[in-house]
Amino acid sequence: KLQYPNPLSGQNEFSALAQQLQVVARTIQAGQAGKLGVKRQVFFVSLGGFDTHNNQNPTHADLLARVAHAMRYFDTALGAIGARNNVTTFTASDFGRTFTSNGDGTDHGWGAHQFVMGGAVRGGDLYGAFPTLVAKSSNEFDSPDQVRNGAMLPTTSVDQLGATLGRWFGLSDGQATQVFPNLANFN
């Protein structure tokens, strides 16, 4: 089903992200049948709209509903073709938001959460450290972990996630640092 329930309107809406993942699942299925002649495949799909600023609360809820629906759809599709244990799906973005308001929403930040899904993934684990939050009011937070203006430095970078998956594909440590030059900034 390529429709998801929009948490704001309560209406079912078309999911372009789920449609992209439908194409990926079909391509994986063709690869399993030996029609493509490749051993490992990499696919990229995208969902924009995360530059929310002052519309963050309602817009972010809808965006996360789209991601949740599309990942569930893809997991179901992979299960139907017997590929769930052979596919790792992950989100990757260096785009985050600040924790503090700029008076009209939040600004661009460095820290963000990523999801990893697949039959070979040890689920339920969180990597990195969640920042300490101190409530200033019902909708305002502060943190001693801020660098400045509400920006947080991530403890686990998207580069580390990408390098881990790259090593699975056969990258050496030296190649990983060439592909992900910020690796040296994280331990």
Regions found by a protein language model. Give the residues of each.
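Membrane-embedded translocation segments of transport machinery
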Residues: L2-L36, Q41-F74
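Feature marks hydrolase-like catalytic cores characterized by long aromatic- and Gly/Pro-rich stretches
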Residues: L36-K39, G49-N187
